[in-house]
Amino acid sequence: MKFQGLVLIDNCKNQWVVGPLIGKGGFGSIYTTNDNNYVVKIEPKANGSLFTEQAFYTRVLKPSVIEEWKKSHNIKHVGLITCKAFGLYKSINVEYRFLVINRLGADLDAVIRANNNRLPERSVMLIGIEILNTIQFMHEQGYSHGDIKASNIVLDQIDKNKLYLVDYGLVSKFMSNGEHVPFIRNPNKMDNGTLEFTPIDSHKGYVVSRRGDLETLGYCMIRWLGGILPWTKISETKNSALVSAAKQKYVNNTATLLMTSLQYAPRELLQYITMVNSLTYFEEPNYDEFRRVLMNGVMKNFC
């Protein structure tokens, strides 16, 4: 369906004029609006992923909650955007859900491709810290992201040093009333996320917990350094069983994983992934220790 030119009416009865299409992913299409500060994300209501996003925005991503958390943790920036408005639009045959969200800049994937598919070690460690801060906030609200990757990390339009982790269509609630979800397989959750970066728990059908997000971030940092994961080529075939088996092979062989993936493997990345692999499914990570390890990688490359 052609959306450009349509007028959408949100939950507060405000009108949004849909502009040109500027992005399309697994969880909806993104269009400009008549307000340059915002974009509108649209997908068929039946798909359900935008409803998941909408629920996450309204339950968790409240500006006051984020600001209070930043103060209490002495962290300057949490890379999560908020939702301006939402609503439904009904065409002749299909009903659509839409979200009005902050407009951001280029995604990290585009930045990496523009830099010959490789970022400096210091930059990768800094980005790792930013994403670690962001998922710590999510985890402490009881949610995992489930799809960390460069195309879901977006730069601020003005301050290019600010990064945002976007696309909340695969967020999972792993804590409820202070209790962790049980370690039970759900076939409907098998292989959720982007196959190359999907955590091993997700391959097996378990809800992504804290260690799953940290595992995915480790895979991403290898790729951002210009590395090729042992299962990168296999993931292009969409054979999830082979990808899962390849990842499992390296769980207790972190050094081999890094030597296979990278010409030069930073010691700090070895420490990071080793620490992730030592976590249990239910365990709360020591985020400060993970930050310390990555910051060591930043400082040794400080100019």
From Swiss-Prot:
- Localization per record: Virion; Host cytoplasm
Catalytic activity annotated for this protein?
A: L-seryl-[protein] + ATP = O-phospho-L-seryl-[protein] + ADP + H(+); L-threonyl-[protein] + ATP = O-phospho-L-threonyl-[protein] + ADP + H(+)
Q: What Pfam family is a match, any one?
A: Pkinase
Q: Which Gene3D superfamilies match?
A: Transferase(Phosphotransferase) domain 1
Q: What induces it?
A: Expressed in the early phase of the viral replicative cycle.
Which EC number(s) does the record attach to this protein? 2.7.11.1
The UniProt entry, under InterPro entries, shows:
CK1_Ser-Thr_kinase, Kinase-like_dom_sf, Prot_kinase_dom, Ser/Thr_kinase_AS
- Reproduce the UniProt comment on modification after translation: Autophosphorylated.
Q: Mostly located where?
A: virion
- Which GO MF terms does the UniProt record name? ATP binding; protein serine/threonine kinase activity
Query: How is this protein organized at the quaternary level?
Result: Interacts with host JIP1; this interaction increases the amount of MAPK bound to JIP1 and subsequently increases the activity of transcription factors, such as JUN, that respond to these complexes. Interacts with protein OPG198; this interaction inhibits the repressive activity of OPG198 pseudokinase on viral replication factory formation.
Q: Which family does it belong to?
A: Belongs to the protein kinase superfamily. Ser/Thr protein kinase family. Poxviruses subfamily.
Under which name does UniProt file this protein? B1 kinase
